């Protein structure tokens, strides 16, 4: 039996984008900082890293498709924060953003990591953006790095 898995190290020549929603920027800025930190710690070249900002989480799938379709990137780390409010808006935005991101990844068969927080309140989001529950931006970039490595291994 053979176990095939990705490694948590970049070769240094991977072109990566971090696609970040600006809405709830107090949270998403911290997620983005975590993702950048992870990228650099694991061998990424900052000159091969692009930060792409969109107004909100609903716009993430549209721009993700543009990035993947450009063929300029080896992978994309998607970050956002959708916080429940008093209306059903949260349900619509989180469902469509999640579905759109997954569909784009499958359509282009390219590594995409999902670092979009969906929380009930601001406190939960803060906990996941660098306090009690770690930094989910760092974790999303870590996932992308492993996916990039695994894809290289499977390519042979």
From Swiss-Prot:
Coiled-coil residue windows: none
MF terms (GO), sorted A to Z: 6,7-dimethyl-8-ribityllumazine synthase activity
InterPro entries: LS, LS/RS, LS/RS_sf
An annotated GO cellular component: cytosol
Highest taxon of source: Bacteria
Catalytic residues (UniProt): 89 (proton donor)
Chain residues that bind 5-amino-6-(D-ribitylamino)uracil: 23, 57-59, 81-83, 114
Keywords: Riboflavin biosynthesis, Transferase
Keyword Iron-sulfur: no
UniProt binding sites for (2S)-2-hydroxy-3-oxobutyl phosphate: 86-87, 128
EC code: 2.5.1.78
Involved pathway(s): Cofactor biosynthesis; riboflavin biosynthesis; riboflavin from 2-hydroxy-3-oxobutyl phosphate and 5-amino-6-(D-ribitylamino)uracil: step 1/2
Biological process terms in GO annotation: riboflavin biosynthetic process
Annotated disulfide bonds: none
Pfam families in the cross-refs: DMRL_synthase
Reactions catalysed according to its record: (2S)-2-hydroxy-3-oxobutyl phosphate + 5-amino-6-(D-ribitylamino)uracil = 6,7-dimethyl-8-(1-D-ribityl)lumazine + phosphate + 2 H2O + H(+)
UniProt similarity note: Belongs to the DMRL synthase family.
Function of the protein: Catalyzes the formation of 6,7-dimethyl-8-ribityllumazine by condensation of 5-amino-6-(D-ribitylamino)uracil with 3,4-dihydroxy-2-butanone 4-phosphate. This is the penultimate step in the biosynthesis of riboflavin.
HAMAP family xref list: Lumazine_synth
The protein, known as: 6,7-dimethyl-8-ribityllumazine synthase
Upper lineage: Bacteria, Pseudomonadati, Campylobacterota, Epsilonproteobacteria, Campylobacterales
Designated gene of the protein: ribH
């Amino acid at each position: 039996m053979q176990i095939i898995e990705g490694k948590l190290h970049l070769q240094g020549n991977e072109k990566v984008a971090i696609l970040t929603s600006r809405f709830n920027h107090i949270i998403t800025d911290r997620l983005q900082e975590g993702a950048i930190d992870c990228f650099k710690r694991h061998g990424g070249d900052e000159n091969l890293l692009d930060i792409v900002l969109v107004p909100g989480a609903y716009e993430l799938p549209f721009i993700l498709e543009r990035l993947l379709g450009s063929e300029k990137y080896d992978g994309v780390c998607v970050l956002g924060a959708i916080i429940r409010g008093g209306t059903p808006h949260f349900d619509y935005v989180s469902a469509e953003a999640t579905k759109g991101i997954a569909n784009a990844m499958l359509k282009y068969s390219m590594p995409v990591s999902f670092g979009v927080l969906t929380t009930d309140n601001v406190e939960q989001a803060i906990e996941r953006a660098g306090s009690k529950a770690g930094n989910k931006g760092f974790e999303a970039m870590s996932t992308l790095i492993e996916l990039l490595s695994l894809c290289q291994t499977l390519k042979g």
